[in-house]
């Protein structure tokens, strides 16, 4: 890939990541798309993470790998600090996690979509992933996403990990403008915000990376019966419903960023928590909200009605 291609910012947050960091760093170096710069915010690592990063910076140059001190307020705040930096001014950015391994064409495929869009509008690339365990053994893949991504889907679920995301400048500007949004899951918020703005969305069904699974994300990220049952349990007995309305409340804070159609839908969503079950039922069918399977649609409808 020629250096005349647009320069891409890779945004990486690190914290005590020495165990897998070299594998991820090497996967950046192997990318078929070469015109990138890696911005790393280290959140006060106590292990050899900084030494490893300094080693790669020495080999590849301080203009290729740029290190910052993180705010030491947790993972979400670390990434928020990265995307908010005025000195990161590339027109395209990809998020990365320290434990993963990118496939060699990840940036190239992301940029094929992003550069083809109207750059005055936000654009978001998302993708499937191959799941690996702590030893790098393949243990599965991300759930199938057969339905078209849209705001009506984003209101009910996130469909991809933020570690697969690629954004253009218009999308980055929206995320920067909403950096104080009171939401729990920044990845989900990116999908919501870009879609609410009328931005271009693409979910690539071809895996772009090896996503390392840990005990904390093993069930939620995998597909299959266990994952479906886990999601249904969260829907009925967990905080899922609270999260949806938290996101809706956050959306109401920034109406000037969304399309008229999106703002109308945000207002109409209130009918889904009306006292009358009949009102909620009518609202469900009139709004056209959906998840990625009929099974999950039915579960969502039942949750709304009880």
Language model region names:
Residues 189, 212-306:
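C-terminal subregions of glycosyltransferases and related glycan-biosynthesis enzymes
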Residues 1-224, 305:
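Nucleotide-sugar donor-binding/catalytic module of glycosyltransferases
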């Amino acid at each position: 890939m020629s250096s005349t291609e647009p320069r891409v910012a890779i945004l990486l947050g690190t914290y005590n990541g020495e165990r897998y960091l070299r594998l991820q760093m090497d996967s950046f170096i192997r990318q078929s798309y070469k015109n990138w710069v890696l911005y790393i915010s280290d959140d006060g690592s106590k292990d050899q993470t900084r030494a490893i990063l300094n080693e790669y910076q020495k080999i590849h140059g301080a203009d290729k790998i740029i290190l910052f001190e993180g705010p030491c307020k947790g993972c979400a705040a670390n990434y928020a600090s990265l995307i908010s930096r005025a000195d990161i001014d590339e027109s395209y950015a990809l998020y990365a996690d320290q434990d993963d391994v990118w496939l060699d064409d990840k940036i190239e495929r992301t940029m094929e979509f992003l550069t083809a869009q109207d750059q005055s509008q936000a654009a978001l690339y998302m993708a499937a992933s191959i799941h690996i365990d702590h030893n790098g053994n393949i243990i599965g893949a991300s759930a199938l996403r057969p339905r078209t991504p849209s705001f009506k889907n984003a209101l009910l679920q996130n469909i991809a990990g933020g570690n697969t995301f690629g954004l253009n400048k218009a999308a980055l500007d929206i995320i920067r403008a909403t950096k104080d949004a009171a939401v729990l899951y920044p990845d989900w918020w990116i999908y919501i915000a870009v879609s609410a703005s009328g931005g271009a969305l693409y979910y690539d069904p071809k895996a772009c990376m090896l996503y390392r699974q840990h005990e904390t994300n093993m069930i939620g990220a995998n597909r299959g019966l266990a994952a479906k049952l886990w999601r249904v349990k969260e829907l009925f007995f967990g905080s899922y419903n609270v999260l949806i309305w938290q996101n809706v409340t956050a959306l109401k804070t920034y109406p000037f960023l969304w399309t008229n159609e999106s703002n109308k839908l945000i207002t109409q969503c209130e009918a889904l928590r009306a006292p009358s079950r009949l009102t909620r039922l009518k609202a469900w069918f009139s709004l056209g909200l959906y998840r990625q399977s009929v099974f999950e649609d039915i579960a969502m409808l039942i949750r709304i009605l009880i």
